[in-house]
């Protein structure tokens, strides 16, 4: 491991010791976000369509390679694309804001906190019967990126189940969470219109400090 790897491993270790799913101080008006997302109803595309048969998961880019909201190639598994299609895909290649970013102030404010240290940012919509099977997003002791997540829409316990490390977890709508996606996690929706915002963040001293300073009790 390089010195940079060791430094990043120490930062990651301190983050994951906060817990598997940690509420931060960042909040958004989830009703307002849901209403504003509706203007992009024709721009959702099947999520991970290159890898899986369509299972009622949809993606909407907040950032993309070109800034075009229909530039959605990155809404596929990076690992799968690299292994089976010989396409090199990196988080830093998909950070140009789309129309979605500019149209929804609540989202823009959150993304701007972490920019330019971001990777992909996108909405997920999981409709009735849609699911993510148990999986882990990152491997190794010093991942280059981590994930923040917020849910809204039909996100009450009767609408879906989310498992993290073998335990059910139900985030509060509109609250932003640090998620340890190295842990085994999955989700299954019983209803239409379960939404999540996924913000991929580059792990460095600045972003580590942002998380630490915004998860501590006031």
Where are these regions (language model features)?
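A short beta-loop-beta micro-motif enriched in histidine and acidic residues
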Residues: 118, 133-148
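A short beta-strand-loop-beta hairpin characteristic of the jelly-roll/cupin
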Residues: 152-172
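Short, conserved beta-strand element in jelly-roll/cupin
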Residues: 125-127, 142-158
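A short glycine-rich, His/Asp/Glu-containing loop-to-beta-strand
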Residues: 110-131
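Asparagine-centered strand-capping/turn motif at beta-strand->loop junctions
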Residues: 186-190
